[in-house]
Amino acid sequence: MSSRKLTLGVSLKMYFGYQQTLDWCQKIHEIAEQHPLASLPSARLFVLPAFPTLAPVVQRFAQSPVHVGAQDLHWTDNGAFTGEVSGTMLHEMGCRYVEIGHAERRRYFGETDEHFALKTAAAWRNGLTPVLCVGEEQRGSTQQAIDTCQAQLAAALNLAQKQQLTGDLVLAYEPQWAIGSTEPAPTAYISEVCQALKQHLPTQAGVREGRIIYGGSAGPGLLSQLGDAVDGLFLGRFAHDPAAFNAIMDEAFTLSSQA
């Protein structure tokens, strides 16, 4: 069987209610338990639910091939930070991943590259794998997109590198202009950007294992079209239907068999 890296992740953002999240996770658990993709050593599956559901979701997936992560974390490990959650607590409760750098954090909460550098360092310091989102705001040339993403990656890793921290990293390429749209960015465009990022990521100090996934209106067929340019997909609303997530798993497994 192929050792090709394959990663499928889902962020539920704030779309689901509490019970709806638990019901969805139960269905995903049932799918993953029986799907051949989940048994591949090189496959990674993760879900990022809302904070109030993390404890029961971690418990639900405790004996499952699906890992759980958070959609954010604070950059310090404890202290008087009302409303915040530390990487220390996330790791203690069983989280494996944490999302950092999403465009919505920039747009709605004023977060900057400096915040993302602090959070990336906090994630590695606490044994969490950052799902680091990068992407250009406006569509231009692929080289402009590559330059933007590489600059965002360098900024996010800057502090962790200074502190000589190491860890795994999932780099999620999400062109901001494609997030929430009805169609993803053109396949050739995504492929060129992700290929460049895939070659660039191993050169970054501190990154033990790096994976490149695409997000931004990702759906069925895209993984096959992108081929080796990406290691997987970062899914949003499409995966709200468990059957749709199952279809993406089918596609990923087929690709692993052909590699």
UniProtKB/Swiss-Prot annotation:
Recorded E.C. number(s)? 5.3.1.33
What pathway or pathways are given for this protein in its record?
Carbohydrate metabolism
**Family annotation (InterPro entries):** Aldolase_TIM (IPR013785), TIM_sf (IPR035990), Triosephosphate_isomerase (IPR000652)
Show the Pfam families listed in the entry.
TIM (PF00121)
* Keyword Chaperone attached: no
Catalytic residues?
H102 (electrophile), E174 (proton acceptor)
Which segments cross the bilayer? none
Per its record, the protein catalyses:
L-erythrulose 1-phosphate = D-erythrulose 4-phosphate
Domain of life, per UniProt, equals Bacteria
Q: What protein am I looking at? A: L-erythrulose-1-phosphate isomerase
Q: Which organism is it from?
A: Pectobacterium atrosepticum (strain SCRI 1043 / ATCC BAA-672) (Erwinia carotovora subsp. atroseptica)
